Amino acid sequence: MTTEKSLVAEAENSQHQQQKEEGEGVTNSGQQETQLEELSQEAAEGDNHCEQKLKTSNGDTPTHEDLTKNKERTSENRGLSRLFSSFLKRPKSQVSEEEGKDVESAKEKCEGGQKEIEFGTSLDEEIILKAPIAAPEPELKTDPSLDLHSLSSAETQPAQEEHREDPDFETKEGGGLEECSKIEVKEESPESKAERELKASQKSIRRHRNMHCKVSLLDDTVYECVVEKHAKGQDLLKRVCEHLNLLEEDYFGLAIWDNGASKTWLDSAKEIKKQVRGVPWNFTFNVKFYPPDPAQLTEDITRYYLCLQLRQDIVSGRLPCSFATLALLGSYTIQSELGDYDPELHGAEYVSDFKLAPNQTKELEEKVMELHKSYRSMTPAQADLEFLENAKKLSMYGVDLHKAKDLEGVDIILGVCSSGLLVYKDKLRINRFPWPKVLKISYKRSSFFIKIRPGEQEQYESTIGFKLPSYRAAKKLWKVCVEHHTFFRLTSTDTLPKSKFLALGSKFRYSGRTQAQTRQASALIDRPAPHFERTASKRASRSLDGAAAVDSDRSPRPTSAPAIAQSQDAEGTVPGAPVKKTVVSKAQKETVKDEEKKEEGPPDQAEPEPTEVWKDLDKSQEEIKKHHASISELKKNFMESVPEPRPSEWDKRLSTHSPFRTLNINGQLPTGEGPPLVKTQTVTISDTANSVKSEIPTKDVPIVHTETKTITYEAAQTDDSNGDLDPGVLLTAQTITSETTSSTTTTQITKTVKGGISETRIEKRIVITGDADIDHDQVLVQAIKEAKEQHPDMSVTKVVVHQETEISEE
């Protein structure tokens, strides 16, 4: 109301007074305008200052809305300055009063609570009378010390005193301090909780970091241990071998069985948890690489666990054997576990306590007992060695089988062994791919491929494919092939070069030691032979220190363990009787050896004489004959599924009228039972010797006069004598005979192994009978041509032409 009255009074004043005061009004107008602007800014800053204190006491932070409101407040300040321009012409008294009101309003805004709200309402009423002004909004928090520089000391001190005297402000500040202290306490409590949670998580990790493993060993015992969760396969294998006291651990591995039928080898270079499905970690300890020659193993304990693996293979049916082989291997098993036969200790059915065959019969047990009783002073290590020497000759020894199909969809079985890849159909081997002939092995999806090296007559490589049940089966077969090839064929393992770019293909490689490296490491073993206990009989081992050194006067093999499995003699006689024996050597020389030659030969190749071996046994002659009869039966049936060679008519004639036999005994014919001697004439032409043998006449007997000529064509051989002394180990023998009205053709295929090298030799005999004259040269050329056409990858080493003609009486 005072402002309106002052305006009316000013209108009633005279004009001359107004003109006098115009100069002063103009000069004072600038000062009043600046003072009003400062007051408006101070009021706004006071509001902001109070809001900032409240926000800082509550622990709030400036937001985006505060930033925008700060800009709006500056615009509002400019609007206030324009509105106050209408009051410039008023007298100083009125202006000073309004300035005091404005200062008081600015001071009252700093006070919180109800005073601020009441002042806001009164201020709004005055603003409505003057001009519409927007209500002030909170701004961004700023430092109050920086905002006070625009105010004088006289203006700031009363405000500070009022703040100090205001109890509400103190309580608010105190509440803010209390909240800050509470916040600090809350900040400490989350840290303690975090530490507690971290410790609890560490405890839980420590609890679940170790995994429990169960490993089924070869002696039907279970080894349990705890390994780290991130442990690799080689860590667990090393712990198992340490438990078993095995140093030659590279031949063994840990297997994971899927559905109890198919096994997967645990990769020693990868973590176990990435290879095992599920929490229970159950494995089996098995032989992974079957050594081709177990005698080269250094320690007896290694051979013992190899024997245990082979026993499991026989019982499960993975290693098929004939009846005679089962009896022989079973007798060595009993000897290894129980020792020599003792009628006081062993009962009548002590063999039935052992599982020796998948279908064990009473007849088999009796045969095993019979052979076991014949052994004397044979140590467990010797029995294990004899067991391995006979088991390694079996066709399925160390073969890892995988089911597959050929390209035509026929079910086959692929076998991986130390020598190569084998193909079986209906339990018969139909093909073989040795490692030297395999260039590359690969798999794609569920298909498995092998690339074969071209032969002599071929120009390009050939690729053979097989279909497997699944992708995992194809990958597993590929891994097994890679591991076997690396272990048996390479001297050291291959390491993949680190490529900077993305490499295609699998990075899997065999990470263990090869067989060559294992043998080098085994040669450095200098510990004494470990004493171990056989689980079946709880019998301690009497080691032979590797069974390498044996007395020369005593053969390490008993009479029932032949050094080399041979088929029965062509004549069908008992080995103990004096016979004339035909031996086909490795170089395919046909020689006839009688008793005198056999006695002069080395003891390794001659059969052990029964009188010398059984001299100290006090046995009767009937038992000796019975024992040797069993030996002959074992020899006869050892090579299972192999037809016995049928002697031809030419074999019988050669055994009695052979010129080589006559030359071997220096021209003297031995006397003995047999048909009457006939007159013979021999002409031998040899390309290697380039000499003609002299005519050897015999006694004249008035029966039949015949003339026999033998012409030998033989390729030059450097190690001919050594080949005769060491014929090698016979793997398979097959005889095929075809007859016509005038000729008989006999083909004999033999496979032998000497020094780790397998050789296949084919001997073809053609006997032509007839009264007409025969062009022998033409027959010879035709026979050689047919042999080369039938077997292009083989070479002819020897051709023998045997001609026998009757001579008319003079």
Swiss-Prot record:
Its main location: nucleus. Residues 660-810 are annotated as: C-terminal (CTD). Residues 1-124, 152-203, 518-613 are annotated as: Disordered. O-glycosylated; contains N-acetylglucosamine side chains in the C-terminal domain. Phosphorylated at multiple sites by different protein kinases and each phosphorylation event selectively modulates the protein's functions. Keywords: Actin-binding, Calmodulin-binding, Cell cycle, Cell division, Cytoplasm, Cytoskeleton, Glycoprotein, Mitosis, Nucleus, Phosphoprotein, Transport. GO terms for cellular component: basolateral plasma membrane; cell cortex; cytoskeleton; nucleus; plasma membrane. The modification Phosphoserine is found at residues 14, 85-86, 96, 105, 122, 150, 152-153, 189, 192, 522, 541, 543, 555, 620, 630, 655, 658. GO terms for biological process: actomyosin structure organization; cell division; cortical actin cytoskeleton organization; positive regulation of protein localization to cell cortex; regulation of calcium ion transport; regulation of intestinal absorption. Residues 62-76, 102-118, 160-200, 587-601 have a biased composition (Basic and acidic residues). InterPro entries: Band_4.1_C (IPR008379), Band_41_domain (IPR019749), EPB4.1_FERM_F1 (IPR021187), Ez/rad/moesin-like (IPR000798), FA (IPR014847), FERM/acyl-CoA-bd_prot_sf (IPR014352), FERM_2 (IPR035963), FERM_central (IPR019748). Binds with a high affinity to glycophorin and with lower affinity to band III protein. Associates with the nuclear mitotic apparatus. Binds calmodulin, CPAP and DLG1. Also found to associate with contractile apparatus and tight junctions. Interacts with NUMA1; this interaction is negatively regulated by CDK1 during metaphase and promotes for anaphase-specific localization of NUMA1 in symmetrically dividing cells. Interacts with ATP2B1; regulates small intestinal calcium absorption through regulation of membrane expression of ATP2B1. This is Protein 4.1. It comes from Canis lupus familiaris.
